[in-house]
Every structure is written in C-alpha cells, then in structure tokens.
From Swiss-Prot:
One GO cellular component term noted in the UniProt record for this chain: plasma membrane
A single GO molecular function term of this UniProt record: acetylglucosaminyltransferase activity
Protein family membership: Belongs to the glycosyltransferase 2 family.
InterPro entries cross-referenced by the UniProt entry: Glyco_trans_2-like, Nucleotide-diphossugar_trans, PGA_PgaC/IcaA
Lineage: Bacteria, Bacillati, Bacillota, Bacilli, Bacillales
Protein name: Poly-beta-1,6-N-acetyl-D-glucosamine synthase
Organism listed in the record: Staphylococcus epidermidis
Outcome of substituting V106A: In strain: 97-337
Amino acid sequence: MHIFNFLLFYPIFMSIYWIVGSIYYFFIKEKPFNRLLLVKSEHQQVEGISFLLACYNESETVQDTLSSVLSLEYPEKEIIIINDGSSDNTAEIIYEFKKNHDFKFVDLEVNRGKANALNEGIKQASYEYVMCLDADTVIDDDAPFYMIEDFKKNPKLGAVTGNPRIRNKSSILGKIQTIEYASIIGCIKRSQSLAGAINTISGVFTLFKKSALKDVGYWDTDMITEDIAVSWKLHLFDYEIKYEPRALCWMLVPETIGGLWKQRVRWAQGGHEVLLRDFWSTIKTKKLSLYILMFEQIASITWVYIVICYLSFLVITANILDYTYLKYSFSIFFFSSFTMTFINIIQFTVALFIDSRYEKKNIVGLIFLSWYPTLYWVINAAVVIMAFPKALKRKKGGYATWSSPDRGNIQR
C-alpha cells in the first residue's frame, strides 16, 4: 500500500512543491527587482567577461551567435570561439568572419566533446568571469549586466545561470518546448533555488567565476552532460549557483521527435552519471540542500521503475471479466487523473503568470495546461528507462564526444 501511495502521490507532491517554491521565489526574490530598471552608464565600472563559444557542426548558426555577442553593449569583453573538429564547414565560416571582426579562434582538429573544447578555450581567457554560450544562442543586451551584478552581491557564487527562451516556434514541438521552458523548467529552477542547490546550470547560457572553475577542476571530459557535472562539483566545493530569470537568451530546440528524444536521453543519462559519481561525496557533505537535491533525483528514478513493475503486475494479473476489479481500477485511474489535471491547471497558471513579465506571448500556452505536465512525467519515465543503463556503462577517463545537433527550423 505504501508503494502504491508513492506511485500515485509522488508526481502530485513534486508539482505542489514546484508551485509553492515558484510563488515564494517570485514574490520574495524576483518581483522586487524590476527587470526594466538597469543602469548602464559609460562611466560605470564593470568586470571583464570572456565569452566562450564551443561548437561542433554549427555552420548554420555560428555566425548569428558571433554577431550577437559582438554587438553587445557590454564594454569590457573578449570572445573566444572553439571549433571542436567539425566535419562541416564551420571552421571556414569562422575564419572568413574573423577577417572583419576581432575575436580569438581555437581550431581543434579532433572532436573530443564540448567539455574538452571549453577546457581548451578557457586557457585563452583573460578575465575572471567566463560566459559559456552554445553556438545557436542569441543573448539579450542586458543579460551580462544582470549576471555580473549578482556576483558583486554574493562572493560565494561560482556561477549564475540565465533564463533560456525558444527561438524556433514554428512547429508543434517548438511551441510545446516553449511552454515547457516557461512553466515546468522555470518552476523547477525557482523551487530548487529556494532549497539552496540547483541541479544544473543551463549549459546554453551561464556566467562562471574562473577561479571557481579552477578549484573544481574545470569541466569533466568523460561526462556526457558537462553542465550537470560542473554544477554538482561547484556545490560540493561550497560554491553557490544563482538562477537569474532576468538574464534572457534565445536558443534553438529540436523540432523532430528523434532529435528531442536523443536530447532528453542524453540529459537523463548525464544526470544519472553525476548521481552515481557524486553519491558518496554528497553524503559526506552533510549539507541539507544537497540531500534534498539528491533525494529528488533518486526518488524520480525509483518512481519510474515502480511504475514499470506496477503496470507489469496489472497486465499479468488483470481479469477483464472481473467487474469489481475493473471498477476499482477505473476509480483509481479517475481519481489520479482528476487530481493531476487540477494540479496541472494551477501549476501552469502560476508559471505562465510569473513568466509573462519576460515573454507575454506564452500566455497562449494555457491551452496545454490540462495535459502537458502529465505527458512530461510520461516522457521522463520512458527516458529514464533508456538512460539509466547507459549511465551505468559510462567509461571513465575518456571523451564524451558530441554529434551534429538538431537545431530545428532556424528563424532569424
């Protein structure tokens, strides 16, 4: 009976936790700071930022990203782009672009993964603060100012992660992911921030303190998701990570089922790799915030496998001629579906209300509010089934290379 209660109520509990955490974070930590009030004076002293752009087969997007960073008003900056052995004409495009623009270019011959590319790029960084961007990303002009200001206020910060938005919204998948980032992922980051530890920075857009990266050994070349891995290392070394929702960037997301599936399996595998690697180190820290974060990861994996076992049991023992059995099963299904739908409506309403100060058009996402979070749990369950065995087979000490990304329909 206890297992059944966990199966039924865990998603509901987590949704309520995200809702309450988001509301509290918004009114206490987010709303008091109006995103429109930011002083940018020519005489204002700012810390220098080294922008790192690691890319692999980004011939269609890299020029847009370079142009975006070069055009930023941020006064003290340098740009370092790393080509990680691309098999397309990415290197040629960068060399041609460099003829008329000032930036550093590290051209690696062999694809050894994003983490290795970032490790090579940071060797060229002149400043204490390092902004890591994906090569399909366009950032708002205000974003670096918001993020660097957070470091001034809190010397314990090791990283400030921004608020990614979706550029390509022409397809159904693009629209769904737009709402997902605005609601579910935003809720999770806000609630985790309150607990004191964020599971992962946004690999697409984060500002690091270089000395903090040096302390933790920079990025791990053998972890499939370098962003999750470095996030946990920062926590273990007593650095804090801040979520800065006012710092916006615009990125491309997969617009094919295959591309989206591959991305989500990689994310889940990376999270599981980190959990397996850092489990005992986390236990030894005796930090409640990390215990909460680790419990959330373990509980999610456990929930998935309980679902599999329970559904298998139902199929094996089902008696379609037993009216009492069918009535009981239908009652449980109806209750859980009604409860989840009700919670989903509240979660989406709260999340999209909060998000409307950054992107008002997302309010149309209300049409998804009765069903998408439920689908989110189903997708995550399927992803975990594929990803966890992969994480168990991770080869230590190698290079987690990357493949050509699915960037969807690029909208300029």
